[in-house]
Amino acid sequence: MTDEIKRLKELVDSSDNIVFFGGAGVSTESGIPDFRSTDGLYHQEWKYPPEVILSHTFYESNPEEFFRFYRAKMLAPDARPNAAHKKLAEWEAEGRLKAVITQNIDGLHQAAGSRKVLELHGSVHRNHCERCGKFYGLDDILRTEGVPRCSCGGIIKPDVVLYEEGLDQGTLEEAVRCLAAADLLIIGGTSLNVYPAAGLIRYFGGRHLVLINKSPVAQDLAADLVITDPIGETLSQV
């Protein structure tokens, strides 16, 4: 056991109100790439950068291309929870982890057994008709091609926060409440540069901050512990 893992274990064992704040890096070990990572093949297939395609304006003006990208890049129905998801669910079952605040939309925390999951950017598992409000699951989107439509004729929109759209106010308020009450905040798999989500961590006033991320982030200087190993590999040793 490395000194970093020992220290992390000490912090976890001495805390009874842990909050985990995570991003795309939490799910990469489940085989879900960060949609922002583009390569040569990306530019052969898509005319626009992902931030443009995943905007409200693009969704409204070009729904066919939006859903082509959405199915190809945002949905990973075969992905399974990794060691990080499982360890967090275990800590919650023990009563020490009070909430998972995630920027991910894949539902893998719930699949691992986590109950208190605040999804800042929504979920691919929730979809609603824009006209009548009828609910549709992920399977309904996967079963269709092109623009998915409700039986009433309306477009079925994923409950995923697009660029230019606001975050759910109730989810934000609950995230702030959980962060303010936490004594240990573990931030993992996020570069903390997607706002307003990343700005939430300023509401944490607890004793200890841990950062687990492959690349350095500005908050490293304020952290009690910084780990640059993969998050699943790290948490599985605690």
What are these regions (language model features)?
Residues 1-238:
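Conserved catalytic core of sirtuin-type NAD+-dependent deacylases
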